[in-house]
Amino acid sequence: ADSIEPYVIFFHSTTRDEKHWPEREWRNLIEKLTALSVQVRLPWGNEKEKARAKRLAKGLSHVVVLPKLSLNELADQIANAKAVVSVDTGLAHLTAALDKPNITLYGATDPTLIGCYGQNQHYLTADAMEKITSGQVFSTLNLLIK
C-alpha cells in the first residue's frame, strides 16, 4: 500500500453512533474519487471498525483496508497522505497536529468548541450527520488534493 500515490485517508469510525457518517455516503465519496486516480486508505482500531472498513472497500479496487497500525504507524500514514476526511475523533486532532489537509464532519457537536485548529483544517457541519452529503465533502476534498 505504501507505493501507490497519491492517497487520502478516511477516519470513518468513532466511539459514539451519532458521530458516524452513513456508510452509503462514505461509499458515494469513495466512488467519486475513482475518476481522480486517488487511492483511499481505511484504518481501523477494533473488529467493528475493521468490518465497517471492509464494507466500505468491498468491490472497489482503489480502496485499501490498512492492517492494524500503531499510533506511530498511523501518524506516518497521515504524514504522507494528500488529505484526510474524518468524523469527530481524536485522530482528526492528530491530523491537525501534523498539519495535513483535513475535512472533519460534525453533526450535533459544535466544531467551534472542540474542533481541530490550523490553516489546513476544514469542517462541514449539519444538525445531523446524515444531512452532510458526499457531494459537499467531495467538492471540498477535490480542492485540497489538486
Sequence positions of predicted segments:
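Mid-sequence helix-capping/hinge segment at a functional interface
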Residues: 1-19, 23
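Short hydrophobic-acidic sequence motifs that mark active-site Asp/Glu residues
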Residues: 7-9, 41, 123
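Short glycine-centered, acidic/aromatic-flanked micro-motifs in structured strand/loop junctions
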Residues: 12, 42-44, 126
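Tryptophan-centered motif/residue detector
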Residues: 16, 21, 26, 44, ...
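Short, flexible loop segments at the rims of nucleotide/cofactor-binding pockets, characterized by
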Residues: 17-19, 61-65, 126
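Donor-binding and catalytic core of enzymes assembling or modifying cell-surface/extracellular glycoconjugates
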Residues: 23-111
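Nucleotide-sugar donor-binding patch of glycosyltransferase catalytic domains
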Residues: 55, 65, 93-146
